[in-house]
A protein has these predicted regions:
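Bacterial Sec-dependent N-terminal signal peptides
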Residues: 1-25
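Extracellular or lumenal secretory-pathway regions
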Residues: 19-123, 127-130, 137, 151, ...
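Glycine- and acidic-residue-rich phosphate-binding/metal-coordinating active-site segment common to enzymes
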Residues: 128-133, 137-194
């Protein structure tokens, strides 16, 4: 039966839906490469990499995995393409939405989480270094943000105060940012001029099998936490040495709890397992938090 459910699950994954609100219309989309230096389960140094899209409208910025950006443009849903974002623990960040707040959506087995925090004034210190990044003349600045020192470049040629993740607040688009230890790096690799809606999902509707093996729709709500509480939870669970050997050690076994595991293929043909759209990490790397507090 498990094998049958797995085959059907791949077919219905494409029909996953979200309750979406359009919160603005962005005229540009900035594309960044995010790299994270970490170690695998054997202690070998590795560098994980993924693309991030950033949109902006009327003071709102949305930073989210590029695969999700592509899905929103093309339609449909392929949860397996979200594996890299799940492995790197990169969620969807809404800066100044609601006004004066930062809202983040992130998946961490077995739930989807929504976190909330105040949008603090970011006190950048302008520095003297200059460079040309992605074809844009860039000036430099540094900041201590949530316990991490960031060194960044920005361009006044693109007069929007946005950047990847929660970074922003400079007099121009951030073109490069790295933390003082060189663990995390964001590099601008493209800028797309387009009119696209900025979408905020209130919840997700997924298709799951009932006790008879028939697939039925199910509303999946976000577990709501404060950003500081969720960060503490991630540091405790993902920072445990057991995580890289058994990535779901802190939660009930998927089959024992849900009675099924979905298996689908990403665009590269790799097989990825998930439960109700939440990716199961099969090749975890050591957790490297982007912020310490």
């Amino acid at each position: 039966m498990k094998k049958i459910l797995t085959i059907i699950a791949f077919a219905v994954n494409m029909s996953a839906m979200a309750q979406k609100d359009t919160i603005g219309v962005s005229i540009i989309t900035a594309i960044y490469r995010y790299e994270c230096k970490t170690k695998d389960a054997d202690g070998k140094s590795v560098t994980d990499s993924m693309l991030i899209a950033v949109q902006t409208s009327d003071g709102i910025a949305k930073s989210f995995p590029y695969e999700e950006y592509e899905r929103q443009k093309m339609g449909g849903s392929r949860i397996a393409d979200g594996y890299q974002a799940a492995q790197m623990h990169m969620g969807t960040v809404f800066v100044n939405y609601p006004e004066g707040r930062i809202t983040t959506h992130e998946m961490l087995y077995p739930y989807r989480y929504q976190t909330d925090e105040a949008l603090e004034k970011r006190e950048w210190k302008l520095t003297e270094a200059k460079d040309t990044i992605c074809g844009y003349a860039s000036l430099s600045a540094s900041i201590d943000y949530h316990g991490v020192t960031w060194n960044a470049y920005y361009t006044e040629d693109v007069p929007v105060s946005i950047g990847p993740w929660k970074l922003g607040g400079l007099p121009g688009l951030i073109t490069y940012a790295t933390d003082a230890k060189g663990i995390h790096t964001f590099t601008l690799c493209g800028l797309i001029k387009e009119d696209v809606p900025i979408v905020f999902a209130e919840y997700v509707t997924w298709f799951v099998p009932d006790e008879k093996g028939k697939f039925v729709s199910q509303r999946v709500d976000y577990q709501k936490r404060t950003a500081s509480d969720f960060l503490s939870y991630k540091k405790k669970m993902l920072g445990n040495r057991r995580y890289v050997k058994s990535p779901t050690y802190y939660a009930p076994d998927p089959m024992a709890t849900f009675g099924y595991v979905e298996t689908s293929s990403n665009s590269s043909g790799d097989r990825v397992s998930s439960v109700a759209g939440v990716v199961l990490i099969s090749n975890p790397h050591q957790y490297q938090p982007l912020e310490m507090k």
